[in-house]
């Protein structure tokens, strides 16, 4: 007999066995596999003294063990060419294999598993490697692998026979659910007793993220459950019932003769004992109030609410009806859009029906700490707050992962189940295996739809698993799960919501032909215009492709007015898609949807908040949203994209005149005028300057009716500074942004490719020739050709030069120094001009300004600012006095003369 132990001893000899002479033969009964004696010829890959492999090696059937010499296996199977052999690797059910190992066989000395696999090898003429040393009842719940080597048709026969008895696809699943990380320790229980009891009762393995213990800044809410579908569903329900319920309220300041209750108050102790809750008092000295927390279990939620109401009545007496309670929960930031719904429809509906206030953190606010970005607060009456909390839990996403051994199935058939059940299905081919990993994602209140989708994918005849979902999870609209609602759920789960905040970049005629959720960026259009699912997005490639398409479209439009690409990495065939204007791209998270409603392709979180009228264009001026300076490409990634379209903006010569003020005068920002003059087609540029309307009028002077006075060269730095200030503004959720040409030619964009050479004779003087990396703003050149006789100093009025010499903020100062790429560093660290003057070289190093030249410029600027302040405080104010605080470019210079003012940096 060749038992499992003898087989292992043969395949993995120990040092003592290697020292012995080789055995001549083995006596095997006729009923067993006689060909097993030829296994002596198979070389052993285990080194002397290593012994048999560990259980882990046996479970995974490592390629480096008994599969190293494929020639020996081919010789044993009678195959002349080893290349004709085919290898198949797949999972089998662990529990079924354990039962088979424990079973007895009809052959003495062989267990059921040994006889099963030996019989398959003998009848199919294949070689099967299986974990014969599998530990029975091990803590690990992972399914082991089996490998088969042989000819293709024989391997398929052996695989079908093995899976008919040990198939795991109908039983083993992995569920990933969202549970507040603050509740994990409560669910686990003291010494892990609570979670152990759940795992034992449901025969599942529940895993909590290990990183939460070591990472103080980032926490994961994901909990994984592994086991049979019935066990996993039961474990999910028990985990939800085991979560803590924590309700808090503020105790108002009572009269001086009214003592404040505390934990030692007999009534408080009675409530704790009667309702099985824990009452915690937390004082807040700065607010002169006390916070009362009532903590209990979800399975006893009614008792927790009753205890809270009694405490409010006891502590607040006559004003108890006015006291509102708070409940906090953790929802992962990437799930906020799913929970809130399209255009926040779920959130608004819950708040309206429950009369509560639900606060989600602003994910775009860089002042919010990472841990606070998942914290959601619900305020209102006790029962209303609890109902709102339950409905938010019902909208949390749940993912179910399982294997699908048949990789020849039509993927489109599986993907068609998305809108049928309101789920989102993804497929992934497992490495070194012929199985597919299928992920079905849905919301927790509709988890039965996930189970139905799995049942249809696997074509199972077993009864449906009925989930235990509380009635509190459902909203009134959930009763009618129609096609539109299911399609909307699929779009939310896919992560690409087609809403006014995230407009589709495809034309409507084509968007309707793709999928029910039109702007899914996980789809690519092939040459036939059909949508096919793709894998992981590659931001860099799509980013480059995006801008290349912009540049090609720009060149075509300059030469022949050709069509422009839509700029998205959804590649639309030219014959199908109508020409679209390239949208402005803001540099944000790669391949992500954020709260401001942008798809973006970089890591910066800055954006342009305000709407700015465009500059007027002169004849022969080339304008492009992708124009940039050669030097700015090495600076920080800023790309201004305005929030609103420029209404009534004068580009060219036909627009209507009139003033258009900005929406935010309270911010100290005044949007300029966009005047259009019909005669020559030259428009006065619109300027954005800080301050009041008076400063705006004094700054925008008019020199003898010069129609181009708004486009002075000295406005350039100021406009660039204002552009960088605008990019630092926090976006407002819900406001639709449309690209404009307001900042064209300012060199603010560092995300665009180098500009194409200008055509001969096309703004050649202003552009500096084809080799120049600059595209100057419209009207920057002198309209009268006086540059040879009059310098810029003489052409600029004194009051204008004084305005330019005064730096009112850090953005203007850094722009004048040519260090605008450091603006973000100073803004993030909340450094204004007052703090700037106190910085030292060590402080600049700590801020990350490593360039020596940049530090020297900044230190010189600090010294000059301090000198100017000292001079202004000591010298008497006189209109004719000249001191070190004189403005930049003050005085008059002869044509061609060089002036170096005292405060030149």
Curated annotation (Swiss-Prot):
Tissue: Abundantly expressed in ovaries and early embryos.
Segments of this protein annotated with the region Disordered: 559-660, 751-772, 874-905
InterPro entries in the record: BICC1_KH, BICC1_KH-I_rpt1, BICC1_KH-I_rpt2, BICC1_KH-I_rpt3, BICC1_SAM_dom, KH_dom, KH_dom_type_1, KH_dom_type_1_sf
GO biological process terms, semicolon-separated: actin cytoskeleton organization; follicle cell of egg chamber migration; microtubule cytoskeleton organization; mitotic cell cycle; negative regulation of oskar mRNA translation; oogenesis
CDD domains recorded: KH-I_BICC1_rpt1 (cd22420), KH-I_BICC1_rpt2 (cd22421), KH-I_BICC1_rpt3 (cd22422), SAM_BICC1 (cd09520)
GO molecular function, one term: mRNA binding
Residue positions where Phosphothreonine is found in the record: 643
Biased composition (Low complexity): 592-611, 874-892
GO cellular component: cytoplasm
Pfam families named in the record: KH_1, KH_BICC1, KH_BICC1_1st, SAM_1
Modified residues (Phosphotyrosine): 644, 696
Domain KH as annotated: residue spans: 172-239, 324-392
Keyword line: Developmental protein, Differentiation, Oogenesis, Phosphoprotein, Repeat, RNA-binding
UniProt feature, compositional bias: Polar residues: 559-569, 630-645
SAM domain mapped to chain residues: 805-868
Positions bearing Phosphoserine: 557, 586, 639, 642, 646, 666, 692, 695
Record family assignment: Belongs to the BicC family.
Function: RNA-binding protein that is involved in oogenesis. Required for correct targeting of the migrating anterior follicle cells and the establishment of anterior-posterior polarity in the oocyte. May act as translational repressor of oskar during oogenesis. Function seems to be sensitive to small changes in expression.
Protein name in UniProt: Protein bicaudal C
Organism: Drosophila melanogaster
Lineage of the species this protein comes from: Eukaryota, Metazoa, Ecdysozoa, Arthropoda, Hexapoda
Gene symbol of the encoding locus: BicC
């Amino acid at each position: 007999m060749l038992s499992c132990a003898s087989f292992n001893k043969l395949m993995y000899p120990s040092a003592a066995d290697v020292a012995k002479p080789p055995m001549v033969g083995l006596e095997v009964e006729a009923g067993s596999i006689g060909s097993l004696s030829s296994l002596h010829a198979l070389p052993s890959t285990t080194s002397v003294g290593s012994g048999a492999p560990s259980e882990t090696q046996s479970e995974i059937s490592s390629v480096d063990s008994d599969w190293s010499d494929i020639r020996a296996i081919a010789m044993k199977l009678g195959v002349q060419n080893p290349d004709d052999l085919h290898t198949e690797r797949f999972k089998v059910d662990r529990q079924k294999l354990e039962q088979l190992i424990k079973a007895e066989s009809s052959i003495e000395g062989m267990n059921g598993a040994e006889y099963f696999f030996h019989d398959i090898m003998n009848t199919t003429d294949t070689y099967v490697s299986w974990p014969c040393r599998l530990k029975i009842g091990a803590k690990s719940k992972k399914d082991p692998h089996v490998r088969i080597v042989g000819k293709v048709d024989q391997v398929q026969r052996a695989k079908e026979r093995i899976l008919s008895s040990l198939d795991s696809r109908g039983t083993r699943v992995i569920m990933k659910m969202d549970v507040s990380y603050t509740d994990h320790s409560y669910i686990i229980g003291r010494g892990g007793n609570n979670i152990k009891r759940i795992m034992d009762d449901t025969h599942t393995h529940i895993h909590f993220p290990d990183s939460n213990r070591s990472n103080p800044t980032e926490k994961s809410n994901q909990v994984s459950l592994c086991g049979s579908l019935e066990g996993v569903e039961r474990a999910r329900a028990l985990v939800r019932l085991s979560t803590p319920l924590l309700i808090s309220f503020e105790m108002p300041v009572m009269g001086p003769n009214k003592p404040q209750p505390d934990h030692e108050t007999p009534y408080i102790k009675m409530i704790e004992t009667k309702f099985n809750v824990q009452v915690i008092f937390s004082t807040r000295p700065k607010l002169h109030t006390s916070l009362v927390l009532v903590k209990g279990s979800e399975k006893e939620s009614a008792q927790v609410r009753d205890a809270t109401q009694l405490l409010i009545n006891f502590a607040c007496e006559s004003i108890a009806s006015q006291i509102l309670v708070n409940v906090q929960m953790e929802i992962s930031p990437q799930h906020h859009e799913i929970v809130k719904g399209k255009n926040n429809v779920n959130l608004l509906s819950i708040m309206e029906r429950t009369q509560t206030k639900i606060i989600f953190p602003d994910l775009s606010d860089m002042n919010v700490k990472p841990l606070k970005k998942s914290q959601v607060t619900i305020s209102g009456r006790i029962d209303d707050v609890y109902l709102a909390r339950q409905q938010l839990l019902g909208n949390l996403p749940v993912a179910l992962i399982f294997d699908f051994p048949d990789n020849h199935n039509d993927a489109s058939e599986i993907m068609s189940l998305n809108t049928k059940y309101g789920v989102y299905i993804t497929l992934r081919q497992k490495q070194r295996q012929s199985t597919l990993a299928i992920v079905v994602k849905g919301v927790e209140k509709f988890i039965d739809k996930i189970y139905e989708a799995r049942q249809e994918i696997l074509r199972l005849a077993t009864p449906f698993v009925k989930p235990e979902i509380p009635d509190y999870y459902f909203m009134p609209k959930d009763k009618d799960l129609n096609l539109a609602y299911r399609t909307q759920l699929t779009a939310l789960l896919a992560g690409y919501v087609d809403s006014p905040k995230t407009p589709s970049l495809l034309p409507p005629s084509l968007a309707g032909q793709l999928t029910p959720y039109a702007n899914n960026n996980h789809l690519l259009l092939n040459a036939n215009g059909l949508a096919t699912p793709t894998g992981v997005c590659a931001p860099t490639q799509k980013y480059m492709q995006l801008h290349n398409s912009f540049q090609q479209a720009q060149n075509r439009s300059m030469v022949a007015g050709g069509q422009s690409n839509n700029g998205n990495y959804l590649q639309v065939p030219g014959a199908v898609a109508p020409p679209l204007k390239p949208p402005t791209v803001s540099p944000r998270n790669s391949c992500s949807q954020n709260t401001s409603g942008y798809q973006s392709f970089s890591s910066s979180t800055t954006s342009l908040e305000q709407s700015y009228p465009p500059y007027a264009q002169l004849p022969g001026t080339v304008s492009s949203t992708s124009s940039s300076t050669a030097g700015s490409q090495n600076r920080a990634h800023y790309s201004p994209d305005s929030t609103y379209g420029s209404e009534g903006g004068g580009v060219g010569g036909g627009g209507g005149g009139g003033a258009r003020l900005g929406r935010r005068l309270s911010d100290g920002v005044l949007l300029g005028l966009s005047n259009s003059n019909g005669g020559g087609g030259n428009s006065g540029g619109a300027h954005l300057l800080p301050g009041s309307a008076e400063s705006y009028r004094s700054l925008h002077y008019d020199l003898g009716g010069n129609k181009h006075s708004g486009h002075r060269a000295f406005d350039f730095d100021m406009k660039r500074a204002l552009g960088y200030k605008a990019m630092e503004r926090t976006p407002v959720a819900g406001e639709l942004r449309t690209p404009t040409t307001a900042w064209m030619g300012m060199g603010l964009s560092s995300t665009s490719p180098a500009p194409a050479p200008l055509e001969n004779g096309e703004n050649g003087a202003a552009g500096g020739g084809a080799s120049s990396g600059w595209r100057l703003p419209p009207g920057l050149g002198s309209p009268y050709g006086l540059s040879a006789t009059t310098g810029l100093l003489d052409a600029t009025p004194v009051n204008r030069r004084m305005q330019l010499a005064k730096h009112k903020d850090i953005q203007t100062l850094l722009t004048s120094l040519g260090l605008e790429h450091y603006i973000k560093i100073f803004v993030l660290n909340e450094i204004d001009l007052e703090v700037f003057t106190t910085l030292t070289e060590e402080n600049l190093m700590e801020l990350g300004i490593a360039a020596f030249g940049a530090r020297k410029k900044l230190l010189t600027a600090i010294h000059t600012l301090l000198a100017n302040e000292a001079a202004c405080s000591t010298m008497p104010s006189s209109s004719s006095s000249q001191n070190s605080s004189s403005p930049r470019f003050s005085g008059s210079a002869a044509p061609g003369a060089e002036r170096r003012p005292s405060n030149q940096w």
